[in-house]
């Protein structure tokens, strides 16, 4: 939206609301990777791991990028997102922020899910290096009330 002429996209309340109706997770470092196409797993070129230091001075490494399955790259966040019963976490790429060469895999994670979550992207362009910068959002999530689905009724008129 910042890239639109005179930032005109901000004048559209539905667009603005979509962009602020949840939380973004930002990359802790620059990353780049490539998918060579076909039945191959993407290869990390830069930023696969990041070293952190605890307040006590201990260093540890954490994965940032993990090649997943054929043509899929996982961005790790390092933690689980648990919600109260009846709520789930809807997660996807940040709205209105496409990344050339990638397609986000949107997920709905139930509140009881015990494992850490990853943001997965399908690589769409073989032999194209995908680069994302430190501080760039790679995941967007919001809390969803599961109960409304039981009450929704559609009235479709042709």
Regions found by a protein language model. Name each.
Residues 1-158:
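DUTPase catalytic domain/fold
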């Amino acid at each position: 939206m910042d890239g639109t002429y005179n930032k005109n996209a901000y004048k559209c309340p539905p667009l603005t609301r979509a962009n602020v109706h949840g939380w973004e997770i930002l990359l802790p470092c620059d990353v780049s990777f490539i998918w060579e196409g076909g039945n191959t797993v993407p290869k990390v070129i830069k930023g696969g791991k990041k070293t952190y230091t605890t307040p006590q001075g201990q260093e540890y490494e954490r994965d940032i990028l993990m090649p997943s399955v054929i043509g899929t790259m996982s961005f790790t966040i390092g933690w689980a997102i648990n919600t109260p019963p009846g709520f789930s976490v809807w997660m996807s790429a940040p709205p209105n922020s496409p990344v050339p060469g990638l397609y986000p895999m949107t997920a709905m994670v139930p509140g009881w899910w015990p494992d850490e979550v990853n943001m997965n992207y399908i690589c769409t362009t073989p032999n194209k290096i995908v680069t994302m910068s430190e501080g760039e959002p790679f995941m967007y999530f919001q809390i969803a009330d599961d109960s409304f689905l039981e009450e929704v009724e559609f009235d479709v008129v042709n």
